[in-house]
């Protein structure tokens, strides 16, 4: 697997649960196959959108195994990050053993290391696990940005081949792209609403929430942008804009799970402490999805 694999659309997969909050592996398998058939470029299970924070280690790896087994021709990039370096290393090693093609590692959260500690954390995993790895900057959840200098330094590691940008700061993303463009390094949007401007700066695609429910349109948008057809890409951005915004009207993945239920893809059941979507937001989401079907 080369860094070129990290170009295009990679759905941050939801995880289906039954009414007792058990993982529904049969539906998960169907979901993975549906996304592959829609033309996505890879799958990202057990990330934030997949509710990895509520899973045991064994459940986490079972989800990876199910997705790996379900698909034929697209890479599986398993979430394996933690705020505990030993835990991140264990999850990464087990994901590799389960057949993952690559790893997505959120930056350490809650204990909020300084840049030196963050770089050591990532290098420890990259030195030990011989898979391509994407570092994930989402300060709204972790409490701290990955410093640009840290990202630039990590881009020199042969196993660290990508950066998921979810800070909402286009200047920061642009600087990372500019300073790593000579490296074996790809920058992917982690915010659907910013995918188009990030690609315009030199990004290579997205790890997408919206692609769970609108994979074909998301693939078309990203494909047009990567081909330089920004007129078509803008048209698709306008079509999907309300969806991008509504999927974050409450904490992700609450709205996307409701959307999956509305589209009869899987149940909206989530694990506690996530709550069902508020009624007024449910109606707003229903209208957005209905507009996309007209």
From Swiss-Prot:
GO terms for cellular component: cytoplasm. Keywords: Amino-acid biosynthesis, Cytoplasm, Diaminopimelate biosynthesis, Lyase, Lysine biosynthesis, Schiff base. Its EC number is 4.3.3.7. It is an enzyme of class 4 (lyase). It comes from the Archaea. SMART domains: DHDPS. One of its GO terms (biological process) is diaminopimelate biosynthetic process. Pyruvate binds at residues 49, 207. It is found in: Cytoplasm. Pfam families: DHDPS (PF00701). PROSITE patterns: DHDPS_1. The record marks 48, 110 as: Part of a proton relay during catalysis. Pathway: Amino-acid biosynthesis; L-lysine biosynthesis via DAP pathway; (S)-tetrahydrodipicolinate from L-aspartate: step 3/4. InterPro entries: Aldolase_TIM, DapA, DapA-like, Schiff_base-form_aldolases_CS. It catalyses: L-aspartate 4-semialdehyde + pyruvate = (2S,4S)-4-hydroxy-2,3,4,5-tetrahydrodipicolinate + H2O + H(+). The active site is at 136 (proton donor/acceptor), 164 (schiff-base intermediate with substrate). The keyword Lyase applies. Homotetramer; dimer of dimers. Belongs to the DapA family. Catalyzes the condensation of (S)-aspartate-beta-semialdehyde [(S)-ASA] and pyruvate to 4-hydroxy-tetrahydrodipicolinate (HTPA). This is 4-hydroxy-tetrahydrodipicolinate synthase. The gene is dapA.
């Amino acid at each position: 697997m080369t860094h070129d694999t990290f170009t295009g659309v990679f759905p941050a997969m939801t995880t289906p649960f039954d009414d007792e909050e058990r993982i529904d592996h049969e539906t998960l398998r169907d979901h993975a196959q549906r996304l592959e058939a829609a033309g996505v470029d890879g799958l990202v299970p057990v990330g934030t959108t997949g509710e990895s924070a509520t899973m045991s280690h064994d459940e986490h790896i079972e989800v990876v195994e199910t997705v790996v087994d379900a698909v034929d021709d697209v890479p599986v990039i398993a979430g394996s990050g933690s705020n505990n370096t030993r835990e991140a290393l264990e999850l990464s090693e087990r994901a590799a053993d389960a057949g993952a093609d690559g790893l997505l590692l959120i930056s350490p959260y809650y204990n909020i290391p300084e840049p030196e500690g963050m770089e050591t954390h990532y290098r420890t995993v990259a030195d030990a696990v011989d898979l391509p790895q994407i570092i994930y900057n989402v300060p709204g959840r972790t409490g701290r940005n990955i410093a640009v200098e840290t990202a630039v330094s990590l881009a020199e590691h042969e196993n660290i081949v990508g950066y998921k940008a979810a800070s909402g700061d286009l200047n920061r993303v642009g600087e990372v792209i500019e300073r790593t463009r000579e490296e074996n390094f790809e920058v992917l949007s982690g915010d659907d609403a910013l995918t188009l401007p990030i690609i315009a700066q030199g990004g290579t695609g997205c790890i997408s929430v919206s692609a769970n429910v609108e994979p074909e349109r998301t693939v078309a948008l990203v494909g047009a942008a990567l081909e330089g057809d920004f007129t078509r890409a803008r048209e698709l951005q306008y079509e999907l804009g309300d969806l991008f915004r509504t999927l974050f009207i409450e904490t992700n993945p609450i709205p996307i799970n409701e959307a999956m239920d509305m589209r009869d893809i899987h149940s909206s059941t989530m694990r506690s402490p996530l709550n069902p979507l508020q009624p007024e937001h449910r109606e707003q989401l229903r209208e957005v999805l209905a507009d996309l079907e007209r």
